[in-house]
Design a protein with these regions (language model features):
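Hydrophobic positions on the alpha1 helix immediately C-terminal to the Walker A/P-loop
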Residues: 58
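Conserved phosphate-donor/acceptor-positioning beta-strand/loop module used by diverse small-molecule
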Residues: 147, 151, 164-184
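Conserved GTP-binding G-domain of TRAFAC-class P-loop NTPases and closely related GTPase folds
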Residues: 179-269
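N-terminal pre-Walker A segment at the start of P-loop NTPase domains
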Residues: 13-35
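Conserved substrate/cofactor phosphate-moiety recognition/catalytic segment
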Residues: 62-140, 154
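The conserved Walker
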Residues: 50-51
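Phosphate-binding P-loop
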Residues: 35-42, 136-138
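Conserved lysine of the Walker
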Residues: 55
Length: 269
């Protein structure tokens, strides 16, 4: 494992930020142009479930993520927002095997804190990079799949409220599995966590399940993923209907009206 020196960390993070800042204003304008008539425009779907629940597998089954497209784009046109992708990439660039995280948490607590908790650390910067990516999608009100664990109810509630303030209609897909299966899958993941952390997050997610159902109301589906299998057709149909139906959010409807007016009058070229 390469020594995670402060110089290497800073250099890596600067390169990340430089890469994102290279996106010009013209691209943001293009996002808005695409967003007006995008099939998944102003639809925000939250994926929740503990580590090892199989959210990535479920996203592929429901939305076609990674099937003939980039992993950041689904067949439905929705953009995937997942900080784990940037996190794992940066771990590898810094010479850390993601499968070693469980061991590092137990045996190298100082390095673990530096990676996951330190301001400017790999996890912190990966989240900031993902937030920048998400802001570009939001500029064009492009549809999004926000992938997370769901172990922090308050944080997810705030994300939902923010999306709705921007004009998005929101939905949640909660991917559920037994603790035993989650622990077994964790051992075979590309990024392995400690059994204690998986168990802790799984329990909190279970406690939050009812709260999420109440928060999202009818825009909520549970996918039992204890055994890998095709998603239930009824669940697939409900989610497809949500993506395709007209925008309900009044803020979103106003944004579409304004964006089309700007486009018509060549304010956006």
């Amino acid at each position: 494992m390469k020594n995670l020196s402060e110089f290497d960390l800073v250099k890596s993070m600067v390169l990340m930020e430089s890469e994102m800042m290279s996106i010009k204003e013209s691209i943001l304008e293009q996002l808005i142009i695409e967003g007006v008539d995008d099939p998944g425009i102003l639809k925000c779907i939250f994926m929740a479930g503990g580590p090892g629940s199989g959210k990535t597998y479920t996203a592929k089954e429901i939305f076609g993520v990674g099937k003939g497209d980039l992993d950041s784009v689904s067949a439905t046109g929705l953009k995937v927002v997942n900080s784990d992708t940037a996190f794992e990439s940066q771990l590898k660039k810094n010479g850390i095997d993601p499968k070693d995280l469980g061991r590092i948490e137990k045996e190298e607590p100082e390095l673990w804190d530096k990676i996951t908790k330190e301001p400017g650390g790999i996890r912190d910067r990966a989240k900031k990079l993902t937030q920048m990516q998400q802001s570009f999608y939001e500029a064009g009100r492009l549809g999004m799949i926000i992938d997370g664990t769901g172990d922090d109810f308050t944080k997810l509630k705030k994300k939902k409220e923010r999306a709705e303030d921007l004009g998005y209609d929101t939905y949640m897909v909660f991917v559920n599995t037994s603790l035993e299966v989650a622990l077994e899958r964790n051992k075979n993941r590309g990024r392995t966590l400690s059994d204690e952390l998986v168990t802790s997050k799984w329990k909190v997610c279970q406690e939050n399940l009812g709260k999420f159902h109440q928060l999202f109301g009818g825009n909520f589906s549970i996918v039992d993923n204890t055994v890998y299998k095709p998603v239930d057709k009824a669940v697939q149909k409900v989610i497809n209907t949500f993506i395709r139906k007209p925008i309900y959010n009044k803020i979103g409807l106003k944004w579409i009206e304004t964006a089309r007016l700007l486009k018509k009058n060549n304010f956006i070229k």
